[in-house]
Amino acid sequence: MKIAFLTSEYPHPKANFAAGIGTSIMNLSIELVKQGHQVSVILYGQDNDETFSDNEISFYKIKNIKFKGLSRYLTQKKIQQLINNLVSDGKIEIIEAADWTGITSNIKLNCPIVIKLHGTDTYFCHLDNRPVKFINKLREKRALKRADGRLSVSSFVAEVTKKIFSLSNDFKVVPNGINLEKFTSDYSSLNTNQNYILYFGTLIRKKGLFELTSIFNEVYEVNKEVKLLLVGRDASDILTKNKSTWEIMKSQFDKEVLRNVEYIGSVSYQEINKYIQNATVCVFPSFAEALPVSWIEAMALRKAIIASNVGWAKEIIDDDVNGFLVHPKDHKTYANKILELLDNCKKRNDFGEKARKKVEEIFSIEIVAKQNVDYYKKVLERKK
C-alpha cells in the first residue's frame, strides 16, 4: 500500500520542531516500511521546499505561503497540488492527517483522507476550560466531517470530540505505538540508587507542571535526598503570557527545594532513553492529553509511573497494577504515592514488569501498524 502522512512535525534533523504527534507518525512510518508499504511524509510549515528520502521514507517539505489574509488558504492549495501530483504519479493511495486546526478543511484530494484524532485545538481548550477561537473550531469540524475515514488514538478523545463538535460519525480507535526494540531496559537500572523523579515532556500548564511544583514541595518535606529532573522544551504560559513556564515554576518551589530540582531542557529523541533508564520513578500530572507516547515509553522501559487519573489515563495505566493514577490537584495523595514507590523497590519493579507486558500486548508498533493498515484498506474499499 502507498500511504502518506500530512503533518507539521516529524523528528528529523531537516524538519522543524517535533513533539508527540511527530513521534507517533515516525514510529508508524518506519514500521509500515518494514511491513512492505511505501510511505511518504508531507511536512508543511517548514523553512524551505525540499524533497529527500531517509530510511526508505520519502519526505516532501513545504514552506508555507505568506500573503496577508490568504496565507492559510494558499498554503492549503499548495499542499493540495503537491499531493494530487503524487497521487497522479502513483506514489500515494491514501493519506492520513492530524486533526489539529483542521489543515485539510479546504483541501480537495484525488485520494481518500483519513483524519486521526490526536486532540484538536477545540478538544484541548475544552479540557483546559479555555475559549476556543471560532475559526479553529469551524475548520476542525469541517475537516472531520469531510474526511473519508476517522481514527482516534483513544476512546476518550473520540467521545469528547464527538460531543464538542456534535458529530454523529464513528471513530476507529487505534492507539499510538512504539518500537519496543528501541526501549529495552538495562536491568541494572531497575534497582537504581539514583533516587530521582523524572518528568519528560513539554513544560506547559496543561501538562500539570504547576501542580508538580506543589507535589514536589510535599515530597521534599519527607525525603530531603530525592531530586526532580525535568527534561523537555520550555513553553510560554497562555494564561499569564509569561514566555517561560520554567521561570514561573522556579518561583513556586520552596527555596531549599529548588536546589534539588534540575531542568535539563530539550534533548533529542535518541537521548531520552538514558534519562528514563536512570529514573527511580516517572511522573505525568497532566490535565490534557489524547494518548501520550511519553507514558508508553516509560512503561516500555519498566518504569513505575504516577500519572494523572483524567480521561484517557485508564486506557494506558491500570491503577495500582502497573502504575498509580492520581488527580494532579490532589497534591498530598500524589506526593504520598511517589514516596511509596521511592521506598518500595519491589513494588516499583512489579509495576515496571506489568507495564512492559501491557505495552507489548497493546502498544507495540508492529501490532498498531497492522491495525492502521486494516483500517486504510476498509476506507479504500468504501471509496471504490
Where are these regions (language model features)?
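Nucleotide-activated donor-binding/catalytic signature segment of Leloir-type glycosyltransferases, i.e.
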Residues: N242-V267
